[in-house]
Amino acid sequence: MPELPEVEIVRQSLNKKIKGKVIKKVLVRNRNLRFKIPYNFEQFLNKKKIKKIDRFSKYLILVFQDNSACVIHLGMTGTIHLVMKNNFTNITNTSFYNNFILPKKHNHIEIKFNNFKLIYNDPRRFGYFSYFKNDEEINNNFRKYGPEPFDPLFDRNYIF
């Protein structure tokens, strides 16, 4: 399972590559991840412009211009790859992925942009994608998890 620093590196890398981009098309190849992906997932993400990529604990949050969001958890073996559309060159940050050969049967979700696509690859299918329509839904979802590890509220007094 990716640890918090790895998830933060993925967030930073995605912020550099997809922030400000518009999703052109979403393709779900397998809805049976840890939680079943809803049938309107593609419709929800289609044509959304990415405002920023946040992180809460080990969750990646794609925040869109309309303040809706897509929340991603990588599970045990999930990885995110950015691949150029025409020549299949992997443009993912190479410092945290050793092998760019992606078995296609584990490419469960593709989010397509103009010149490249984001591929979610997960052999064990323990990761998941969900979406939230606004800030209130997002905050309600994460309220039960306690403070973010880098939040000033997370100190020795909170623990003890």
Protein language model annotation of sequence segments:
Residues 70-160:
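Phosphate/anion-contacting hairpin/loop surfaces
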Residues 1-70, 74, 85-93, 110-114:
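Extended, highly charged segments
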